[in-house]
Curated annotation (Swiss-Prot):
Homodimer. The tRNA molecule binds across the dimer. InterPro entries: aa-tRNA-synt_IIb (IPR002314), aa-tRNA-synth_II (IPR006195), aa-tRNA-synth_II/BPL/LPL (IPR045864), Ser-tRNA-ligase_type_1 (IPR002317), Ser-tRNA-synth_1_N (IPR015866), SerRS_1_N_sf (IPR042103), SerRS_core (IPR033729), tRNA-bd_arm (IPR010978). HAMAP family: Ser_tRNA_synth_type1. Its EC number is 6.1.1.11. This is Serine--tRNA ligase. Disulfide bonds: none annotated. One of its GO terms (biological process) is seryl-tRNA aminoacylation. It catalyses: tRNA(Ser) + L-serine + ATP = L-seryl-tRNA(Ser) + AMP + diphosphate + H(+); tRNA(Sec) + L-serine + ATP = L-seryl-tRNA(Sec) + AMP + diphosphate + H(+). It is found in: Cytoplasm.
Amino acid sequence: MLDIRLFRNEPDTVKSKIELRGDDPKVVDEILELDEQRRKLISATEEMKARRNKVSEEIALKKRNKENADDVIAEMRTLGDDIKEKDSQLNEIDSKMTGILCRIPNLISDDVPQGESDEDNVEVKKWGTPREFSFEPKAHWDIVEELKMADFDRAAKVSGARFVYLTNEGAQLERALMNYMITKHTTQHGYTEMMVPQLVNADTMYGTGQLPKFEEDLFKVEKEGLYTIPTAEVPLTNFYRNEIIQPGVLPEKFTGQSACFRSEAGSAGRDTRGLIRLHQFDKVEMVRFEQPEDSWNALEEMTTNAEAILEELGLPYRRVILCTGDIGFSASKTYDLEVWLPSYNDYKEISSCSNCTDFQARRANIRFKRDKAAKPELAHTLNGSGLAVGRTFAAIVENYQNEDGTVTIPEALVPFMGGKTQISKPVK
């Protein structure tokens, strides 16, 4: 959520930033109009309350002097009714303002390129060279079925489209990837490992920006009023919701693996085969809490943490900065890492790393103190995929496939695969 003072002090800046995202800047005028009404109501209510205090003193004085106080008692009742009415109007305006403010996205950083879609994202780095095959490479969905690593048909029978059973060495590879990623982030990148709740309440989803605007993208357990998480970013960021982080704690760096659940509303017809776009998938997440002056350097560091995984696995990738028309709701700036997939003859997103500045912290009331005597300030929150496990799985299977149908295990994963160096079709 944005600071109301930005609307008051820099309305034109806010309008231009909102317009860059393709949203209607008139919302700024709506907020300012409601804010003016609110301030007038507060002023009028305070005057009434001051008068009520004065009248209360007059009533007490008249009673002490055994004088008739009917007139001031009547005024007191009228003031009480009027104050109650003003408070009701104020609550209504507050509700309207919050309803509008919570749907306004974060302000985009000045160095984010302008554009309308992912076609306008700007490449800033490329690593590795896509492999030239001496044979016709197969898509990962064909490879995993031939090697008995996955079963899409039975998953469709059990759960519907966009689900998968990982079987045999497919399940082992998925587990190995998660263990490898978590181990690297905790032992080399300084993150604290967390196991997170995968069902969360509405306040938690509100804190990170999924609610109320993106409810159609979520799965909800109606009976309990809980939501399945779309990413571990949600419970990890909300760890400090409604808390003041004590001096000396920041920077705080969390990493955690979880299943992620997404309805994929609006993605009909896109990536319908394989592991790229599922309703349920595994992901290792990185979340950071930073002092405001440190968050931009933290974004660069976190992105290189994700890149280190891809480089150690030997997977060609590129880094792009998302344009104004493609960046997420809560982010001020986002880097996407895209891995090379031979079946697409293109790069596909495998990680998204964002600085959300104080946007989520304001929604979730996450503050910190620089020292014991200092006034609490809003922290900056960052999040990044480190990495999407299913897409990493797909990238390994495609990039490390062999002409005889086997798949070579990247050297970095061999210890996590029990020493296994190759995946072959099971004997039975």
